[in-house]
Amino acid sequence: MKFTIIIPARYASTRLPRKPLLDILGKPMIQHVWERAKQAGGHRVIIATDHSEIAEVVTRFGGEVCLTSDKHSSGTERLAEVVSKMNISDDEIIVNVQGDEPLIPPCIIKQVAENLDNHQVNMATLAVKLTQRDELFNPNVVKVLSDKNGMALYFSRAAIPFARDNFPDCSDDFVTQNQYLRHIGIYAYRAGFIKQYVQWQPTALEQLESLEQLRALWNGEKIHLDIALETPEVGVDTQEDLERVRLILSNK
């Protein structure tokens, strides 16, 4: 199995300006992500960025970079531009790794690629089991349901499935026992499917939930879902997240 890893790295960030370039123990954050991705077994790792400063930094540490438009409204549109510019074949497996995940386990990057390769689907992703009530009711934590065949039924910021007789006053034990799932934002696709995906218009569901993957379900595509082999640490969205990542890495 051959797969390509693409890491989108946007320069602009509301809460953390120049986020991919923020220092973590002497290296820019995007380099930490790239180094993790290189360990996953893909034959190619490409960093897709909309800014020349990021491109220059990536080139200096030895990474492959694709300079993309700064007009994209979604990460998948950026992937589509990379697939086109780099002449990636339609049957190539593409794994999208977020550029703000400096602690992402390499094993789950390989896992999601293998899952796509082993199933007759165009898209695959991962989840982990929820253990805390607060996470279940946190709209920033995306929940997901799957069917008996491991195909995603729905993604939501709401607490799903809704336990009529137990919500909202349920315990952490209740959450654990009922195997609620938190979605992890890592995806594998066929390159040709990415081109198809960006031709579809945004749907009402994805706009309501602000969850781009719902466009695929709305259009009848199946998304394979599996439990991640390793639970990833938090991504970097805030200054507090950044400090936590610095602390974790300094203790390794």
Swiss-Prot record:
E.C. designation(s): 2.7.7.38
Gene Ontology MF annotations: 3-deoxy-manno-octulosonate cytidylyltransferase activity
Localization: Cytoplasm
Reactions catalysed: 3-deoxy-alpha-D-manno-oct-2-ulosonate + CTP = CMP-3-deoxy-beta-D-manno-octulosonate + diphosphate
Any single Pfam family the record assigns to this protein: CTP_transf_3
Pathway assigned in UniProt: Nucleotide-sugar biosynthesis; CMP-3-deoxy-D-manno-octulosonate biosynthesis; CMP-3-deoxy-D-manno-octulosonate from 3-deoxy-D-manno-octulosonate and CTP: step 1/1; Bacterial outer membrane biogenesis; lipopolysaccharide biosynthesis
Superkingdom, taxonomy of origin: Bacteria
Gene Ontology, cellular component aspect: cytosol
Keywords: Cytoplasm, Lipopolysaccharide biosynthesis, Nucleotidyltransferase, Transferase
GO biological process, one term: CMP-keto-3-deoxy-D-manno-octulosonic acid biosynthetic process
Similarity section: Belongs to the KdsB family.
Role summary: Activates KDO (a required 8-carbon sugar) for incorporation into bacterial lipopolysaccharide in Gram-negative bacteria.
PANTHER family: 3-DEOXY-MANNO-OCTULOSONATE CYTIDYLYLTRANSFERASE (PTHR42866), 3-DEOXY-MANNO-OCTULOSONATE CYTIDYLYLTRANSFERASE, MITOCHONDRIAL (PTHR42866:SF2)
Protein's name in the database: 3-deoxy-manno-octulosonate cytidylyltransferase 2
Organism: Actinobacillus pleuropneumoniae serotype 5b (strain L20)
